[in-house]
Amino acid sequence: MSSIGIGLYGTGIAADNHAYAIAKSSKFSLVSVADEKYNLAQSFSKRHHIDRCHGDLEYLLEDSSVDIVLLASPFPFNSKHFPFIAETGRSVIIETPLAPSLKEAENSRVPKYGWVKHCPCSALRSNIW
């Protein structure tokens, strides 16, 4: 059975923690990383031995090896990035709040895409990774 490909958007401190957790998994592999600051994506990909890095979310979403997108951008931007990811039909993992307010979350078009579950990352790591 091949592993499920994770594409990571955002390269901050939380992203490092996710990368270390994913590296320990036999079920998942970190196949692609992107950050709007391309130099950060490059250094992150070298540090975590990821073959593909991008300077834009759009390029990450064009990567056919990405099955799930782990959105690790600062939370005020999650509601902006989420619809673009969801429109590809991929599952999205977001550890932080979707938006700074309920109104922004509702306006992010989440209801259009279906199921949403609050799943703290620590529970995700212990149950899946």
Can you say where each PLM-predicted feature lies in the sequence?
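Beta-loop-alpha module in the N-terminal Rossmann-like domain of NAD(P)-dependent dehydrogenases
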Residues: 48-110
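Short alpha-helical
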Residues: 13, 39-40, 76-77, 100, ...
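Structural signature of beta-strand start/N-cap positions in the alpha/beta core
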Residues: 5, 29-30, 65-68, 91, ...
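N-terminal Rossmann-like dinucleotide-binding module
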Residues: 1-48
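Short helix-capping segments at alpha-helix termini
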Residues: 26-27, 88, 113-116
